[in-house]
A protein has these predicted regions:
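A structural signal for short loop-to-beta-strand junctions that line the ligand-binding cleft
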Residues: 91, 98-99, 128-164, 175, ...
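C-terminal lobe and pocket-closing loops
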Residues: 290-302, 313-412, 446-448
Length: 448
């Protein structure tokens, strides 16, 4: 599951209006005392998965196991990936939220800002001390309080065509510059041996839609020592126009404009497109998550590609870390059972069901519970690469009131310099920093 973000620039004002409407609508269900408590009331559990999918089957198994263990009735609703946000806003307007929502860590700011979730007492969560700290960080709001219980984590690594690397006689890249050189070879040296100029070294989802370009570029930006914003006192200041950040963006622009190692149409490609590019043999290096392994094993062949950690840059080794949380929605008539569900989902029993070992429905990529060894359960050492990346280099998005706005704004800024090769990066990043500054003020997160 990829990040679920806001619409591109054209829809930002409309999205903001929708959020304001949602906030007003949620006011009636944001108070803990607004719903009379009834511990016999069944839980309604939402997950952002398509009905009938293996992932939905795993979520159904999780829900049934919870009921079997606790005696608490719960009904799973697999809400389609494409209309999840719409349906949630409809229920918000009706002041009738589901009890539980399993959704991205990146949505925490949106949900908190709109008053749709209630606070969680980390110390009061049974088994909470077994949940890794980095996962808890992704459940923490800008105010330092927790608004969810972690359920799933993931980090991103490089899938590299192993057979192509052997064909061009290249070593595993040790730096981002090495990675670019490998991408050049994959682009120019006919690694598939078909005699045609039809391969790309780097597969990049560069569209602004849902903030994909920022999602991809975060790992590279941080590795090169850059950042989006910098913590200063109780707030943040823009860092995207600092020298290290600008240097990283220039390298990104170079991939599109100088070495030209990206696939055709990269600046408008989303993940559905890039998945196809990689598995169809048209691209050689793809930064993505472990959830893609089953698909690529089946379509491309397990022997054709390898999993390696993204190399360190000038700033060391870093990789975007994400995941899903169990959100305890506001206005529930059964708050005690809400928390029990979240505790079960994060427990070893819940985590093992989420691994989807039996049915391939992977809703837990990397376990958040220290007592579960995902690699051992799956018996696939490639997952250990992702686990080590998460443990040693994983980095959550900045803890802002609403990070998704910054993700969208930055994606548009980055796309501007890769879509127009004549665009001056220094100037573009100064302009982006100004946008960040305005957004920080708007969110009340600007450092004094």
């Amino acid at each position: 599951v990829l990040i679920h973000l806001r619409k591109p620039r054209g829809g930002r004002r409309a999205a903001a209006l929708a959020a304001a409407v949602a906030m007003a609508a949620a006011a009636g269900c944001s108070s803990a005392s607004s719903a009379k408590q009834d511990e016999s009331k069944p839980l309604e559990v939402w997950i952002r998965q398509d009905a009938g999918s293996p992932a939905a089957e795993s979520a159904e198994a999780l829900t049934k196991a919870f009921t079997k263990k606790t005696g608490i009735k719960a009904k799973l609703v697999a809400v389609g990936v494409t209309d999840f946000e719409t349906k949630l806003q409809q229920r918000t307007a009706q002041k009738n939220l589901p009890d539980i929502v399993i959704n991205d860590t990146g949505q925490l700011g949106n949900l908190v800002t709109q008053g749709l979730v209630r606070e969680v007492d980390r110390k009061g969560v049974v088994g909470g001390n077994e949940i890794v700290d980095r996962a808890w960080e992704a459940a923490q709001g800008f105010d330092g309080k927790y608004y969810a219980v972690p359920f799933n984590s993931q980090a991103f690594a490089l899938l590299v065509r192993k057979d192509w690397r052997a064909k061009v006689g290249a070593e595993i890249p040790k730096t981002w510059n090495d990675l670019t050189k490998l991408a050049v070879k994959f682009t120019k040296d006919d690694p598939d041996g078909n005699g045609k100029d039809d391969t790309a070294g780097m597969v990049i989802p560069g569209t602004t839609t849902r903030g994909y370009l920022t999602w991809w570029f975060s790992t590279m930006l941080w590795s090169e020592g850059g950042d989006f914003v910098t913590k200063k006192g109780d707030g943040y200041v823009p860092a995207i126009n600092e020298p290290a950040s600008v240097k990283a963006v220039k390298k990104l622009q170079g991939m599109f404009c100088d070495s030209k190692v990206v696939q055709p149409g990269a600046s408008t490609a989303d993940s559905a497109t890039t998945h196809t590019v990689f598995e169809s043999g048209k691209g050689g290096i793809y930064l993505t998550g472990p959830y893609m392994l089953p698909r690529f094993d089946a379509s491309l062949g397990k022997d054709k590609y390898e999993v390696i950690a993204a190399p360190p840059g000038a700033g060391g080794r870093a990789a975007l870390a994400e995941g899903e949380n169990v959100y305890l929605m506001a206005g529930s008539a059964n708050e005690k059972s809400q928390q029990k569900f979240a505790e079960f989902a994060a427990s070893p029993a819940g985590q093992k069901i989420g691994l989807g070992v039996d049915n391939g429905g992977i809703i837990v990529r990397l376990p958040v519970n220290i007592k579960v060894d995902g690699t051992a359960e799956r018996r696939d050492p490639r997952w250990e690469v992702f686990q080590k990346v998460y443990d040693n280099a994983g980095r959550n998005a900045p803890n802002l009131p609403n990070w998704s706005n910054f993700r969208q704004i930055s994606s548009e800024g980055f796309n501007g310099v890769v879509s127009d090769c004549s665009r001056d990066v220094d100037q573009a990043m100064d302009e982006l920093a100004d946008e960040f500054d305005a957004e920080l003020k708007k969110q009340g997160a600007k450092a004094e």
